[in-house]
Amino acid sequence: MLDLAIVGGGPGGLMSAWYLKKKLGGLCNITIFEASDRLGGKVLTGRFDSAPAVYEAGVAEIYDYSMTGPDPLRELVQHFGLQTIQMDAEQVQLDGELLNDVPGMRRKYGAKTADAIEAFRKRCSKMVSPLEYYEGIGAHDNEHPWAYITAEEVLDREIDDPTAKRFFKVMARSDIATETHNTNGLNALKNFVMDVEGYIGLYSIQNGNDQLIECLRSEIDADIRLNHRVLKVGKTEGGRYQLRMVNGKGPETHDFDLVLMCLPHSWLSTMAWDGEDLRKSMVKHVAYFDRPAHYLRISILFDKPFWGDQIPGAWFMSEAFGGCCVYNEGARHDVGQHGVLNWLVAGSDALAFANLGDKALIDMALKSLPASLGDARAHFKEGKTHRWLSSVNALPGGLPARDVMTNHRPEPKQHPGLVLVGDYLFDSTLNGLLDSSDAATDIILTEMMRLRRKQGQDGKLLSDKIDRNYFENYRGLGPYHEVWNQFTDPAFLVDLIKKVWNRAKGYKLLVAGSASGELVGALRARGIDAWGIENNRAIHGKTPKELKKFNKLGSIVDMPFKNGEFDFVFETSLCHVPNKRVVPAIRELNRVVKTGLMFGSVTSDMPAPLIDRYDLLRGVKKLGTWWEWSELFFNNGFDLSMHRHDCTDALWTATLAANKGPGQWYADSDSLRYSFFDKVEDED
C-alpha cells in the first residue's frame, strides 16, 4: 500500500483527505501533519468567556452558487446534514449614518449619486454575466478588458461622482481584502456584482462554521499529527518524498510516495525545498501568487442588542477602518439575551492595526459605531480579536490566469507526486478551496494509479505494449473481434447521441480508435454513416474487406479528413497518445467535427478493481481523470454539452439499463457528464 502525506490540517487538508477517501478508498495510508494544536485553520468559531455566545472568528460566510449551477460545497454541507442560515443585508454606514443601499444614498446624497451607483451596477452586470461569474477563474479571464487595469483605474474611468465611488470602495473592501490599486478591475468586478440580484447567495452554518471541520474530521481516514511543523521537502535516493519536520520533542524525518501541500500561501513561503529543480519551481510558484491580503477580527459581546431594530440584516458595511463589514452575529447564531457585533477589518488597515493591542482595537471598534445606535460602551461586556494576516490573496488565481495543472503541480517532471492545494489558486473562498482540493486529489489519483501499475499486479510486472498479443487476448477475455462488444455497445452509443444532441439518424460519425472496424460495421448496419481511424497496423489489417473503405489507417494527430466532415466523433484512443501530442490530437478532432465529441478513453478515476480486472492501463500514455481531460477539451475548442442541454439524469438511466454503470465502466453520473463535449467557436 502506498503512503501519502498531507501537510496542513486546515480546511484544505481535511477536504483533500475527504476526497481521497471518496476517490481512493483504502488504496493508501494517509498522514496529516498540522503545525498548530488544532485542525481547521481559518475556519474558527469562537465563544466568549463571560457568556455562551457564538461568533465567527475566521471565515465569515459561505458563498451559495446553487442558483446558477452545481455547488459542490453546498452539496457537501447537505451531505453532512448541516443546517444553514441564509444571510443578507443592504445597509452601509457613510459619514456616521446608516443608510439603506441606493434608496438611503438617494435620500442623503441626492439623485446624482444614487443614479451613478445604479448605472455602475448595470455596467458591471454587462461586464460579467451570472454564468460567467459562476464559472470562476479561467483562461477566459485573460481576455477580459478589466483584467489588466487596477480596480482603482476602473472606478476612476467608470464613475464620476466621488460619493458613489466611495460607496463602492466601502461595499467591496472586506471582500477583496486589499486596496483598489493592489488588485485588478476584474477581481473587483466579481465582488461588485455580489450586491446585484441573481449572482450569488450567502449563508452560514447553524451553530458555527466549524461544524464543517468537525464533520470532515469524522469522515476521513487518516493518522493526524498535531504540533508537527514541516520544514523541508525533498526526495530520497530511492525516489520517495522526504519530509523533515519538528514537533514538541525534536526533529523528525518521514518518507512518502505522494505529498499534498495544503498550506496558505504565506506558510508555503516559509518552506525549504531540497534539490534545485524543485526549489526553482517552488520559488516561481510562490512569486506568481505573492499578492498578500489581510484580515483582522474584532468581536464584541454586549449585555443586550442595544441597537434594537436599527440593524435588520446580518451585517452592515462601514467606512470605518477604510471600509469594513460589521456582522450582527445574533442574526445567525445563538447569542442568548446578548448582542454580538463582529468587525471584519481588511487590507492595509488590518495589516497596520494588527500591531496594536487587543484593548486598543476593541476601543477603536466601539468608537466606529454610528451614534444613532446608542451608548455602546455602556453595554460592553467582553471583546476578542483574531489576526489573519496574509490569509487571503489580493489577486486570486494569478495574472494571467493559468491552467489548473500548472498551478497545482509546479514541478511535474521530477516531482509529479508533489501537489499543492490552496484557495489562492482559485478565488480565496472556501468554495475555491474545495475546488482546489478536488483538482489536486484528481492529480494525486492519477499518480497513484501510475505507481500501482509500476509496482505490478500480484507481484508481476505488466506489459505496456499494444501489440498482436494485446488484441489476440483483448483485456484478458479473448480475440478482439469476438469480445469488442462487451466494451462498446453500438445501440447504447446511438441512444446516448440521440439524448445529448437530439440526432437519431442522418449523421456522419467518426470512431477514433476503431481497431479492425467491428464498431464501424455495426453502426453502418444501423443506418449510421460511420467511419473509423486506427493507427495500429496489425489490428487494422484484420478489417473486413467490405469495411476497408470506411476504416482508415492513420493517426488522430493528422487525419485524412476534411474540416467539419463529421457530425460526431466517438473517441477511445486519446489516452494512447503521448503527452506531447495530446493537445494536437484534440485540436485535430476539433477540426474534423461539426457538432460534438463523446470521450471514451480510459481514465484514472475509473474504479481500481475495474482497471485491474481488464488491465485497462496497458498502453496508456496519457493518464488523467475525467476532470483533467475536460480541462484539455475546454482549452481546445470544446465545452461541456451539459452546459447547453443538461440531460445527465436521462443518460444515467440509459447507462444503468445498458449495464454500463458501476462496476462496468461509468462509476457515477458525473463521469457521464464529463464525457460529452460540444464544439464551440472562440466567441462562445
Can you describe what each PLM-predicted range is?
Residues 583-597:
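A short glycine-rich, Lys/Arg-flanked "PGG" loop and its adjoining helix->strand segment in the class I
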Residues 21-49:
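Glycine-rich FAD pyrophosphate-binding loop
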Residues 132-229, 236-241, 255, 267, ...:
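Active-site/ligand-binding neighborhood in enzyme catalytic cores
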Residues 452-558, 586, 670-682:
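Conserved N-terminal segment of class I S-adenosyl-L-methionine
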Residues 2, 15, 23, 47, ...:
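Conserved flavin/dinucleotide-binding core of flavoenzymes
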Residues 77-183, 454:
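Mobile amphipathic helical/loop "lid" adjacent to a hydrophobic cofactor/ligand pocket
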Residues 55-58, 597-621:
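Short, glycine-/aromatic-enriched active-site segment of Class I SAM-dependent methyltransferases
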Residues 228-345, 352, 372:
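Mid-domain catalytic core of redox enzymes
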